[in-house]
A protein has these predicted regions:
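N-terminal FAD-binding dinucleotide-binding subdomain shared by FAD-dependent oxidases/monooxygenases
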Residues: 2-10, 15, 20-160, 175, ...
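Rossmann-like NAD(P)H-binding beta-loop-alpha module
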Residues: 181-203
Length: 297
């Protein structure tokens, strides 16, 4: 490999939920291993720092999405984005991870040397424009699957003629006031499911457009089992028992969706009908064309 480069044992790419978690594990279980984290943005937290749209929250329960080494202690199983971000940064502080993060470092190339048995990773600094290199034995890629630069926006014919604001929820305008406005939300995925109910209290009219329906189920924000266990068990036990309950239920639900998809589909759509009443067109607006096992609810 050409040129000098700082040498470490492990390079972690990304300081979000996965990257911080991996760094904490290295600090705890491999204290003799040196590591650096490349983070392209100016702050840690990844998705939970970038996304600022109203109502942002987890669409998975935090007992399974949180770290096994750091119990989730909040009463909300479906947590707001601010709580998740605080949780990630608390973990980073507890394990002294912050000093290992190189902010505004975007990994742009990686080269393997068979003779040296090491990677050489090049990063570009957004603050100075210079390129820096690190040599490492292992790369732990935690960059996620979102394009942080820009969310996907279809080519809508005539959008340039629209006189109002058009923007992607991923890049929510700071201090946006939508009080009394007429708003159209395009899409009915996880973002829309959290965004629309929150905005509906302040807009004069809110319409959500969807290309095709997705499976939706109503679940309590707080887990009733965890709430009951908190009355007589320590927080760590509550976390572990609730976490395993959630994991086993998800395994059961997945297997049920594979073995008896029609029955599970019938049950979920029945729950929707019960929520909306007999006069709502559930077949048109809430009945997906795909099987349950192909995507999360």
């Amino acid at each position: 490999m050409e040129g000098s480069a700082e040498a470490v044992d492990v390079l972690i790419i990304g300081a979000g939920l996965s990257g911080i978690g991996g760094a904490c594990q290295l600090r705890s279980k491999c204290p003799d291993q040196s590591f650096v984290i490349f983070e392209s943005r100016e702050a840690s937290g990844g998705t939970w720092d970038l996304f600022r749209y109203p109502g942002i929250r987890s669409d998975s329960d935090m007992y399974t999405m949180s770290y096994g080494f750091k119990p989730w202690r909040d009463s909300a199983a479906i947590a707001d984005g601010d709580k998740i971000l605080s949780y990630i940064r608390e973990a980073a502080a507890e394990y002294d991870v912050e000093r290992h993060i190189r902010y505004q470092h975007r990994a742009i190339a990686a080269q393997w040397s068979s003779s040296e048995k090491r990677w050489r990773v090049t990063a570009e600094r957004s603050d100075t424009g210079e390129q820096v290199a690190i040599s490492c034995r292992f790369i732990f890629s935690c960059s996620g699957y979102y394009d942080y630069e820009s969310g996907y926006v279809p080519d809508f014919t005539g959008v340039e003629d629209f006189q109002g604001q058009v923007f992607h929820a991923q890049h929510w305008p700071e201090a946006l006031d939508y009080t009394g406005k007429r708003v159209v939300v395009i899409g009915s995925g996880a973002t829309a499911v959290t965004l629309v109910p929150t905005m509906s209290h302040q807009t004069s009219r809110l319409v959500m457009l969807q290309r095709s329906p997705t499976y939706i189920a109503n679940v309590p924000q707080e887990d009733p089992t965890a709430q009951a266990l908190r009355k007589f068990l320590p927080a760590t036990w509550v976390f572990r028992l609730t976490r395993w309950k959630k994991v086993l239920f998800q395994i059961y639900l997945y297997r049920l969706s594979r073995r008896r998809p029609k029955d599970l589909r019938r049950f979920l759509l029945g729950q929707v009908r019960q929520e909306l009443g007999p006069d709502y067109d559930v077949a048109k607006h809430f009945t997906p064309r795909y099987d349950l096992s192909l995507i999360h609810i």
